[in-house]
Each structure stands twice: as structure tokens, then as C-alpha cells.
């Protein structure tokens, strides 16, 4: 089992798909990494040699921000917005949509489950 960036990659999947299990690596980045290292897109993780896994690990460590570092960066960016008390920061703080979506209806993902209001029947 290949372990890259603290993530155990599934051995029976193709390399491109398995790399997307790492937070911060999508399909495009996975294809770019495979092309850079000359790894065939159809190869399975279990067919990779230890040297190839090491190459992938070194490439990801050198060129990409992944997993914990990426999560930390994202959290720090949101915290910075909240500390600035700018509009986006206030929306984050209140748990409302940040990017201008409507909230009169919908927005249930950010607002949570609907709370009934007494005497609101028509």
C-alpha cells in the first residue's frame, strides 16, 4: 500500500484516480504529475515500484500544497477575513452564504435545518 502525504492510496485503483484521494490534488494535477514522471495513466497503484512511489511523493512534496498545510492555509485565510470584519468575514462568522447567494429561500446548507416559527401559518 502506497502512503503519500499521510494518505494511504487504494491499491486496486488507477494511479490518476488514487492520487485524487489526497486533499489538494484533483484530476488535472494527478494527470500532470503522472505525465511529468512518465507513469502510464492506466497503471494501478499496486503495480508501481517503490522508486516510482518515492518519485511521486517527492514531486508532491516539492511542488504542491496538500493535506494539512492546505487545510491550515484555508482556515487561516477564513480566520483573517473574520478578524478583518470585512463583509465576507462577517458572513463566515454568521454562518451565511459568502458569495452573494440568496438567503430568503434556500441556503439551507450554510444556515442549517429550518427552525419553525410559532404563529407563522397563513
Curated annotation (Swiss-Prot):
Pfam families: Ribosomal_S13
PANTHER family according to UniProt: 30S RIBOSOMAL PROTEIN S13/40S RIBOSOMAL PROTEIN S18 (PTHR10871), SMALL RIBOSOMAL SUBUNIT PROTEIN US13M (PTHR10871:SF1)
InterPro entries referenced in this protein's UniProt entry, alphabetically: Rbsml_uS13_C, Ribosomal_uS13, Ribosomal_uS13-like_H2TH, Ribosomal_uS13_bac-type, Ribosomal_uS13_CS
Job of this protein: Located at the top of the head of the 30S subunit, it contacts several helices of the 16S rRNA. In the 70S ribosome it contacts the 23S rRNA (bridge B1a) and protein L5 of the 50S subunit (bridge B1b), connecting the 2 subunits; these bridges are implicated in subunit movement. Contacts the tRNAs in the A and P-sites.
Name this polypeptide is given: Small ribosomal subunit protein uS13
GO BP annotations, alphabetical order: translation
NCBIfam families xrefs: uS13_bact
Taxonomy, superkingdom: Bacteria
PROSITE patterns xref list: RIBOSOMAL_S13_1, RIBOSOMAL_S13_2
Family, similarity comment: Belongs to the universal ribosomal protein uS13 family.
Organism encoding this protein: Sphingopyxis alaskensis (strain DSM 13593 / LMG 18877 / RB2256) (Sphingomonas alaskensis)
Known partners and oligomeric status: Part of the 30S ribosomal subunit. Forms a loose heterodimer with protein S19. Forms two bridges to the 50S subunit in the 70S ribosome.
GO cellular component: cytosol; small ribosomal subunit
Gene Ontology molecular function terms on file: rRNA binding; structural constituent of ribosome; tRNA binding
Region called Disordered, residue ranges: 95-122
Keywords attached to this entry: Ribonucleoprotein, Ribosomal protein, RNA-binding, rRNA-binding, tRNA-binding
This protein's record includes keyword Cytoplasm: no
The keyword ATP-binding is assigned to this record: no
Amino acid at each position: 500500500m502506497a502512503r503519500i502525504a499521510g494518505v494511504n492510496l487504494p491499491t486496486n485503483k488507477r494511479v490518476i484516480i488514487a492520487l485524487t484521494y489526497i486533499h489538494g490534488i484533483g484530476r488535472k494535477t494527478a494527470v500532470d504529475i503522472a505525465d511529468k514522471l512518465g507513469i502510464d495513466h492506466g497503471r494501478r497503484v499496486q503495480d508501481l515500484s517503490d522508486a516510482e512511489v518515492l518519485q511521486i511523493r517527492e514531486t508532491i512534496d516539492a511542488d504542491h500544497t496538500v493535506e494539512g498545510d492546505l487545510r491550515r492555509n484555508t482556515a487561516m485565510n477564513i480566520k483573517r477575513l473574520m478578524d478583518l470584519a470585512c463583509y465576507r468575514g462577517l458572513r463566515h462568522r454568521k454562518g451565511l452564504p459568502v458569495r452573494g447567494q440568496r438567503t430568503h429561500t434556500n441556503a439551507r446548507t450554510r444556515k442549517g435545518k429550518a427552525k419553525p416559527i410559532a404563529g407563522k401559518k397563513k
